[in-house]
């Protein structure tokens, strides 16, 4: 499978870079590497839609200057690309997310992730905050659903924190395969990885649902998530901006949830809702 690597130069970089990631994510882009000049984004070559990209907000506003170049990369070349920039991430001095080539450190939870083209290493604000939520809440003996699992890192930490029954679901085949690899790499034995979307959810009820996707998918699927949540369960949502929190909360309240708290990092939000 061939991918396009698009190198975006953005001025000023923030918050435009974060906005561009969100917009490109809705166009099928799978992975992003941020840098001082902007970001590098990856999309399957046969899914790239130039017209749709040029119609997104950041290309139509004059608030930012954006230029880009592209080149074709084959799937196996991704390892060399992310290894150049992937540094270990320490969350709350308890959880280290690292690559196989990083040295192990003395932390409570050591997670080894080889992300390849998948989203979810802890570098992005949304993943970092969702990992923080897991560390701040009791997962012992809980059943957990990780929607849009990416690398599987959230489900992996949830199991390490005591969750006993877990499902990790992603619609992208690459993420599905990568999650299987990372689950095995971290010696997790209670995570079932599935390929698909919210339509896979049946009558199974969960104590905790984690969904780090994007605003539009969350708004569409919140009703389904609530139907799969046990009494006194918790729903953690991320992948949206602070200005979207009111809209997300209104949808959760519509289906019987109550807002409890949210974390915020660089205008990104990760919120907790409970029955």
Where are the regions that the model predicts?
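N-terminal auxiliary segments of SAM/dcSAM-dependent transferases
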Residues: 2-106
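A short hydrophobic/small-residue beta-strand
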Residues: 31, 165, 235-236
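Short, well-ordered coil/turn elements that cap or connect secondary structure elements
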Residues: 63-65, 92, 106, 139, ...
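Active-site beta-alpha loop architecture of Rossmann-like, nucleotide-cofactor-dependent enzymes
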Residues: 104, 120, 216
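A short, charged helix-loop
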Residues: 109-115
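Conserved SAM/SAH cofactor-binding pocket of Class I
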Residues: 117, 121-202
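S-adenosylmethionine
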Residues: 171-275
């Amino acid at each position: 499978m061939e991918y396009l690597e698009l190198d975006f130069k953005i001025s000023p970089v923030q918050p435009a870079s974060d906005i561009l990631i969100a917009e490109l994510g809705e166009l099928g882009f799978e992975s992003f590497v941020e840098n001082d000049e902007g970001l590098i984004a990856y999309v399957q070559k046969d899914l790239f839609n130039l017209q749709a990209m040029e119609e997104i907000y950041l290309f139509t506003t004059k608030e930012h200057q954006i230029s880009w170049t592209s080149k074709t990369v084959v799937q196996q070349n991704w390892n060399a690309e992310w290894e150049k920039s992937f540094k270990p991430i320490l969350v709350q001095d308890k959880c280290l997310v690292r690559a196989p080539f990083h040295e192990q450190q003395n932390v409570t939870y050591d997670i080894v992730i080889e992300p390849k083209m998948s989203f979810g290493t802890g570098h992005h604000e949304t993943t970092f905050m969702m990992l923080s939520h897991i560390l701040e809440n009791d997962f012992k003996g809980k059943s957990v659903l990780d929607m849009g699992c990416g690398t599987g890192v959230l489900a992996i930490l949830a199991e390490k924190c005591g969750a006993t029954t877990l499902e990790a679901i992603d619609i992208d085949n690459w993420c599905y395969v990568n999650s299987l690899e990372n689950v095995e790499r971290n010696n997790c034995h209670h995570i079932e990885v599935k390929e698909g979307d919210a339509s896979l959810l049946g009558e199974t009820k969960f104590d905790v649902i984690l969904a780090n996707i994007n605003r539009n998918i969350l708004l569409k699927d919140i009703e389904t998530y609530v139907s799969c949540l046990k009494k006194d369960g918790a729903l953690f949502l991320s992948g949206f901006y602070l200005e979207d929190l009111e809209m997300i909360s209104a949808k959760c309240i519509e289906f019987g949830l109550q807002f409890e708290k949210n974390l915020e990092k660089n205008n990104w939000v990760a919120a907790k809702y409970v029955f």
